[in-house]
Regions:
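Beta-hairpin "wing" of winged helix-turn-helix
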Residues: 72-82, 86-88
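Alpha-helical residues within the helix-turn-helix
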Residues: 54, 65, 71-72
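Short beta-strand(s) of the beta-wing in winged-helix/HTH DNA-binding folds
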Residues: 48, 59, 71, 76-77
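A cross-family signal for key residues in well-ordered alpha-helices
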Residues: 27, 36-39, 71, 77, ...
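Recognition helix of helix-turn-helix DNA-binding domains
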Residues: 62
Length: 121
């Protein structure tokens, strides 16, 4: 059992955001290429598609489609810098998804503690 199971859910996990709101984030992150793009964008500043495809065998078109899925989920956004289009990570939706996972973890811990109490009674 986790030590957090005896505590009430963290403030951020008290159903502030409906769990359904995080589903598009989890769906977008369910692809290895998109997960890699998020990792790259989290580690640095805004990047162009050319920078994101550098050293990979992924086409510019494929990366553009993956970035659009991530943008639709609210995980990245594009920024115009002159004629160049840069992409950057948007942490807010990831934070919401983390809070959803915290809520689920708390619910499971709470349910397991109740089961343990019944079994030991």
């Amino acid at each position: 059992m986790s030590s957090r199971s005896s505590r009430p859910p963290p403030e951020s996990a008290r159903n502030v955001f409906p769990l359904q709101k995080s589903a598009p984030v989890f769906a977008a992150l369910g692809d290895a290429t998109r997960l890699r793009l998020i990792a790259v964008l989290c580690a640095g500043s805004a990047m162009s598609i050319a920078q994101l495809t550098s050293g990979t065998d992924i086409s510019h078109q494929a990366v553009t489609k993956h970035l659009q899925v991530l943008a639709d989920a609210g995980l990245v956004r594009d920024v115009k810098l002159g004629r160049e289009r840069l992409w950057e990570f948007e942490p807010e939706r990831m934070d919401e998804a983390r809070r959803s996972l915290d809520e689920i973890a708390w619910q499971w811990d709470h349910a397991l503690n109740r089961l343990k109490a019944v079994v030991q009674a």
